[in-house]
């Protein structure tokens, strides 16, 4: 993630639910910028369509340069408040950062491959927390479970990290567990119960 986009933002002069609602109706997202590089929180609005496209392309850990009426701030997404009904973005928290700074982020874990025949995989954790340079935040980590047998587990410690990225997550955090399908387990229990019933009848 060495490159980042520049998005224009406008300073908010009005506050409150009514003001935020009017901004959203006008196609804008209310946002707050905070961090060591800003003396006080900056309240701004950004274009909804432009920002939504950025998230689709770069992910929820995206780094972006915010152009606030000519003043530029390097920021990263810290929190997205999304409407549960419309899925539109209602509000943003953006952290002001510096080049060369390291930050802690939750990075998605993608499972690839198929385990041994007769087994299935269960993903216990969808993300892991790592520390990375703000301009080199991994978009995702891939974990291969190809051919893994029943009982095999993948933990946070097993994930290969890129470059200077370091693991913050507990190394023993379970990511993927290889198990037998629950249906087979239920059928086995039913068979045992039926067998016991037949023996009792005899």
Swiss-Prot record:
Compositional bias segments (type: Acidic residues): 183-202
| Pfam families cross-referenced by the UniProt entry | Ribosomal_L25p, Ribosomal_TL5_C
Q: Which GO terms describe its biological process?
A: translation
- For whether the record's keyword set contains Zinc, the answer is no
Q: Which InterPro entries match?
A: Rbsml_bL25/Gln-tRNA_synth_N, Ribosomal_bL25/Gln-tRNA_synth, Ribosomal_bL25_b-dom, Ribosomal_bL25_C, Ribosomal_bL25_long, Ribosomal_L25_dom, Ribosomal_uL5_bac-type
Protein purpose: This is one of the proteins that binds to the 5S RNA in the ribosome where it forms part of the central protuberance.
> What's the name of the protein?
Large ribosomal subunit protein bL25
The gene coding this protein: rplY
